[in-house]
UniProtKB/Swiss-Prot annotation:
Pfam families for this protein: NAD_Gly3P_dh_C, NAD_Gly3P_dh_N
Amino-acid positions noted as binding substrate in the UniProt annotation, renumbered to this chain: 142, 344-345
Biased composition regions of type Polar residues, renumbered to the chain: 199-210
Keywords: NAD, Oxidoreductase
Species per Swiss-Prot/TrEMBL record: Colletotrichum gloeosporioides
Reactions it catalyzes: sn-glycerol 3-phosphate + NAD(+) = dihydroxyacetone phosphate + NADH + H(+)
Species lineage: Eukaryota, Fungi, Dikarya, Ascomycota, Pezizomycotina
Keyword Mitochondrion: no
Protein known as: Glycerol-3-phosphate dehydrogenase [NAD(+)]
Residues binding NAD(+), per UniProt: 16-21, 48, 119, 175, 344, 373
Length: 420
């Protein structure tokens, strides 16, 4: 595809190398190789360096090395496989595992973030002043941060922390299935900043940047809006015209594969909220399934849960959130279905009810020190709603928190959500 006269290519870096980070890097590297007119072929993947030992049963076992620890980056670059976090999956040979965060992002114009959310602040601190000022980001980090003070999107944490614009990727995306190239879909939310050269209008403003024979934008139209539709405090640097436009078309070319279908939207808040709130609903689905109430009850939970997800987005993000993001996209209803069918929030809640234990007890027993996202999100959302006197407007979210706290039982759910 033509790059509209651009004479420079985009360099891509993936920040993070867990199972999902490595999977996304595999996808991106396949597409940079397939689109040499748009992207530099080499994709750097930042790896938090650690020592690994290659097991004797591995095809990569070297008797000369034996059980001696090896650097994970060295293993990835030599064998083109992340033997620790994505074993058995061959990675493209144009992926370069890099233990230096600042070196990995050098000269990159597209940054893909895929790491645990608790590391965002530290990573942004290390990157500040070391990235291209006009770089653009995509956050693959599911969820949002909810406190009594408000709701913040991880994409905005990144964008504000680095002074760039950052979109979000989320959906019914189980990393191991995608890495094995089993067909799935995802949603990418990206609302191209109005000062960037774009081949299509930004859906919210309907005002494409000039450069395509369109009248120049006014200073007001040129202002970048945040996910709530307010003028952003972050002052963006436009992407230079010598690069291919960073818009829906190019991000689809970067992420879309025959086995990984991408739908583009502009609703960053809706996509981000879907990835967080569905975990609360998944707990409720696990509760009723553990009680043995069957598929009808679980379907009722998903209906009420989806309604509350939409209402929450509309109430706290206003005009920027679209109902269709929740009802039509992978980041909404599809991710909800997956999470309510076999996700770990669902499984742990189901086991807790079936065995007469608390979710916390199951969590400690089953997750090897990891924590459920649903329990923390339920607590944060309840505190947020309670501070605003809105608990009754979200009966399912409130019921889940009540069950986790021991104030309600699963048997109370039908009466608690009866008016939904």
């Amino acid at each position: 595809m033509a790059s509209l006269g651009a004479d420079k290519k985009h360099k891509v870096t993936v920040v993070g190398s867990g199972n999902w980070g490595s999977t996304i890097c595999k996808i991106v590297a396949e597409n940079t190789k397939a689109n040499p007119d748009l992207f530099e072929e080499a994709v750097h993947m930042w790896v938090f360096e650690e020592d690994v030992v290659i097991d004797k049963s591995s095809p990569y076992y070297d008797p000369a090395v034996g059980d001696a620890p090896q650097k994970l980056t060295g293993v990835i670059n030599k064998y083109h496989e992340n033997t620790k976090y994505l074993p058995g999956i061959k990675l493209p040979d144009n992926i370069i595992a890099n233990p230096s965060l600042q070196d990995a992002v050098k000269d990159s114009t597209i940054l893909v973030f895929n790491l645990p959310h608790q590391f965002i602040g530290n990573v942004c601190k290390q990157l500040r002043g070391h990235i291209m000022p006009f770089a653009r980001g995509i956050s693959c980090i599911k969820g949002v941060n909810v406190s009594d003070d408000g709701i913040s999107l991880f994409s905005e944490w990144i964008g504000d922390g680095l002074g760039i614009y950052c979109g979000a990727l989320s959906g019914a995306n189980i990393a191991s299935e995608i890495a094995a190239e089993k067909w799935s879909e995802t949603t990418i939310a990206y609302d191209p900043p109005p000062m960037d050269n774009s081949r299509a209008p930004t859906p919210r403003s309907n005002s494409p940047a000039n450069g395509n024979g369109i009248a120049p934008l006014t200073p007001v139209e040129m202002q970048h809006k945040d996910a709530r539709g307010r003028t952003s405090k972050t002052k963006l640097t436009p992407v230079p015209a010598e690069y291919p436009p960073l818009d829906h078309q190019i991000f689809k070319q970067l992420f879309h594969r025959p086995y990984f279908h991408v739908r583009m939207v502009s609703d960053v808040a809706g996509v981000s909220l879907g990835g967080a709130l569905k975990n609360i609903v998944a707990l409720a689905a696990g509760f009723v399934d553990g009680r043995g109430w069957g598929d009808n009850a679980k379907a009722a939970i998903m209906r009420v849960g989806l309604l509350e997800m939409v209402n929450f987005g509309k109430e706290f993000f206003g005009q920027t959130v679209h109902t269709g993001t929740f009802t039509e996209e992978s980041a909404g209803v599809a991710d909800l279905i997956t999470s309510c069918s076999g996700g770990r929030n669902f499984r742990c809640a189901k086991m807790a009810v079936a065995e007469g234990l608390s979710v916390e007890e199951i969590e400690k027993r089953e997750l090897n020190g990891q924590l459920l996202q649903g329990t923390s999100t339920a607590k944060e959302v309840n505190s947020f709603l309670k501070a605003r006197g809105l608990e009754k407007d979200y009966p399912l979210f409130t019921a889940v928190h009540g069950i986790l706290e021991g104030r309600h039982s699963v048997d109370d759910i039908p009466s608690l959500v009866s008016d939904s």
